């Protein structure tokens, strides 16, 4: 939310009410909702609603289930960025699906590593006690 600036819209799509509540308690987004991430048309409709028909500039998919590629692609505007950061992603489905619906989006693959990522992650935990608390609850 910090990086999106005052005019940026950060949206959190969760898979359950529990996950939505967990994210909402961190207050890291402007809008929150939960739905089935494999429901591509539902996700498209929600993205259209939240962006007044403009769709998202950037979509980050970190869902750990299969068949969520099209929901991310349809929620993204043409020339936008879809960042797939899940081992469940099928890049064949993503590439052929985007072509099949005529979406010209830039698709990036997250591999879990980038220079300095460990320091950034640790700094986020140091800077935000809410995130540190959640991290400890989930992984300690």
Which ranges hold each PLM region?
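Glycine-rich loops and low-complexity Gly/Arg-rich segments
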Residues: 10, 36-38, 56-58, 83-86, ...
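A short, terminal or domain-edge coil/loop segment
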Residues: 36-39, 66-75, 136-140
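Short amphipathic alpha-helical surface micro-motifs
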Residues: 15, 89-90, 139
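A general structural signal for well-ordered secondary-structure junctions
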Residues: 7, 29, 106, 130-131
């Amino acid at each position: 939310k910090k990086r999106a600036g005052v005019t940026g819209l950060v949206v959190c799509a969760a898979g359950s009410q529990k996950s939505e509540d967990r994210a909402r308690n961190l207050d890291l987004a402007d809008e929150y909702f939960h739905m089935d991430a494999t429901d591509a048309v539902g996700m498209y409709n929600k993205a259209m609603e939240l962006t007044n028909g403009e769709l998202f500039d950037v979509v980050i998919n970190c869902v750990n289930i299969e068949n969520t590629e099209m929901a991310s692609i349809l929620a993204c505007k043409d020339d936008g960025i879809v960042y797939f950061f899940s081992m469940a992603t099928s890049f064949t489905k993503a590439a052929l699906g985007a072509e099949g619906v005529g979406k010209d989006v830039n698709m990036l693959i997250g591999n879990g590593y980038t220079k300095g990522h460990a320091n950034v992650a640790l700094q986020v935990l140091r800077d935000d006690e809410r995130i540190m608390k959640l991290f400890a609850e989930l992984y300690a």
